[in-house]
Amino acid sequence: YFDAIEITECTDDEERNAVKKILEQSHMKVCYGAQPRLLGPKLNPNDIDEKGRKAAENTLLEAIDEAEYLGAKGIAFLAGKWEEKTKEQAYEQLLKTTRNLCDYAAKKDMMVELEVFDFDMDKAALIGPAPYAAKFAADMRTTHNNFGLLVDLSHFPTTYETSKFVIQILKPYITHLHFGNAVVKKGCQAYGDKHPRMGYPESANDVKELVEYLTVLKEENFFNSEEPLVLSMEVTLIGDEDEEIVLANTKRVLNRAWALVED
């Protein structure tokens, strides 16, 4: 069923070598998500304190090395938290970090992708919403062609945007796709950027929304059989949910949505 896999930092060399061995045998496209390297230690690639920014950059440079070792052709990361009064300064810091990452990745023929997140709800990252992400991506592409954006259906409700709006605005820069779900009603269980299963109570995304997402991607010519983009499902467990059941749920929703996308 799966042709691609997303991995992140391994705990030690033993695990890293074991993972590499499995991936080499699997005939899967390998992607590397560096987001946990930032979120766990609360590192910020747009930190206006240069020491903090450099710490975030260093772990992302390490991520590029680890990704290369594991067979991935790039990394994905996210922007950090921000304050209105220093927003422009933070933007310049993020450009500095991302350009340094792209310089390093280019030597290895690798990509650097920035995932677009909510700006005021949960992660409260500097990048998005979509128009601001487009501005950043345009600035990056003036200097680096190995930069792209990762967009996630589960984040659209958290940025008060629609699939059509996001995809059409970011079309020139999108290199990676996620889908999932979010609860954006305050006071409800799993509120914020928690990625509950599709169709979760009081949540924003189910079959209908995934059909809309896939349809606009098809209309905007994102589906290329020769060089397909990665479309990953990003779903987590809430409470005592069973991972096999939730995985089956996600497959069913994707299968049904794909069947409903008109030829």
Model-identified regions with their sequence ranges:
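N-terminal pre-domain/capping segments
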Residues: 1-62, 68, 144-146, 248-263
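Acidic-and-aromatic substrate-binding clefts and catalytic sites of carbohydrate-active enzymes
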Residues: 4-18, 83-85, 120-127, 153-161, ...
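Short, glycine/charged-enriched secondary-structure capping and boundary segments
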Residues: 19-23, 46, 89-92, 127-129, ...
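Active-site acidic/histidine proton-transfer and metal-coordination neighborhood
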Residues: 46-148
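Histidine-acidic metal/acid-base catalytic patches
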Residues: 71-73, 134-148, 157-263
